[in-house]
Amino acid sequence: MVRPSVLEKLQAVQPLAELWWDSSPLVYDAWRRRMIAKADDPREMTVCLDRLFCDANPPEQNLFRGVTTNPRLTLNAIKDNPAYWSGWIDDVIRADRRADAEAIFWKTYKEIARRGAGAFLPQFEASRRKYGFFSAQADPRARHDADRMTAQGIELHGLSPNIMIKIPGTAEGYEAIRRLTARGVPTNNTVSLVISQVVACMEAVSLGLREARAAGVDLSGWRSVITVMSSRFGTLGALQPEAEEIGLDLSESDVRWAEIALMKRACRLIEENPAYPGKMLLSSMRVSPVVDGYTHVWHLEKIAGADIVYTLPPSFLESLLFQAPDLEFTNQWAEPVPPPVLEKLLRIPYFERGYREDGYSSGEFTSHPALQTTAKEFSLAARHMVEFIAERLRLFS
């Protein structure tokens, strides 16, 4: 009998917690084959991965309960099968020789989202719209345009009822979340890094729900999650530089605790706010730290037991399954950050501000260095897709 995987052990601590696939479902089969080929015990790995997701499973038996994507992950789906997508794009060009690269980009982006959502639509239907959501992101280049993000969200959601719209944590993004919620469109607040953004999202969703209910909008297929990009807060911002400026030496464990402290606080805020009927979603996790020679995954261990969503990219899953397969979990999410560690972290302005509910105004969200870096990364991926399509167009000129 094959032993429970590390992911099954995590979910056993809190059965309401959800595991999502952080990539396009279109790349899952190729990734699965690579993982099995790399495994010391291919049979055990096959069983493990087929428990995560397999078309042959009854939908309710798959451990993966949803999907998150972004432009970079959508681009990866094209790179995973470039010959096919080149041909598909060429057919689009032939069908409409007047379409430019941006128009074909958007059509291609929607098609990859539609197919990915289709892989989880059976679960969405079997669970009566509780699980099986597919997060498709509005164009990150429009992150300061509430009108455009709202229109794109409505268009993307129209492709499949289980498509949830990822909207970034900018002031304009929260306005778009309010508008989409008022229409009954499910949302995922992405590029969220600090507690002020969590508060802003809860407020936007609560306002949108009030409007939706007043207008009699059908909310049976609606849902909200708030994504905290955990390690991006610790590694892309000013945590280490500001610590050095005031003479603090931060260990790898300290950095992980900083990220975990934010997630724990966000989970508590949701528990205390019944007007927000959504969940936190934990992303950007790391296999870390190593303590006394033992490899930990504190992003999972210290949050285990919380009723949240964990979204798991292929690279993290590979590290987890090969480096920490014997990890055990106990219910730790409500346990406080060690007081000496929290006191140390609160001396760092970057952390102290991120930890406070009023640390940032909505207009200041876009100034956060980790948000800026992440938004540029996602925007660059969108531009790369446009450039790929422009190359195909040049073949027809």
Regions found by a protein language model. Give the residues of each.
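Active-site-proximal loop/turn and secondary-structure-junction residues that shape catalytic pockets
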Residues: 25-27, 71-73, 110, 135-142, ...
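C-terminal extensions of enzymes
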Residues: 325-397
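Catalytic alpha/beta core domains of metabolic enzymes, predominantly
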Residues: 186-333
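Active-site beta->alpha loop and helix N-cap motifs at the rims of alpha/beta catalytic domains
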Residues: 61-64, 71-172
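Hydrophobic faces of well-ordered beta-strands that scaffold small-molecule active sites
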Residues: 17-23, 40-50, 65-69, 132-138, ...
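An N-terminal structural lobe/cap that precedes and organizes the functional/catalytic core
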Residues: 32-42, 50-83
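Active-site-adjacent beta->alpha loops and helix N-cap segments on the catalytic face
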Residues: 143-149, 167-181, 194-205, 293, ...
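N- or domain-start disorder-to-order transition segments that initiate the globular core
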Residues: 1-48
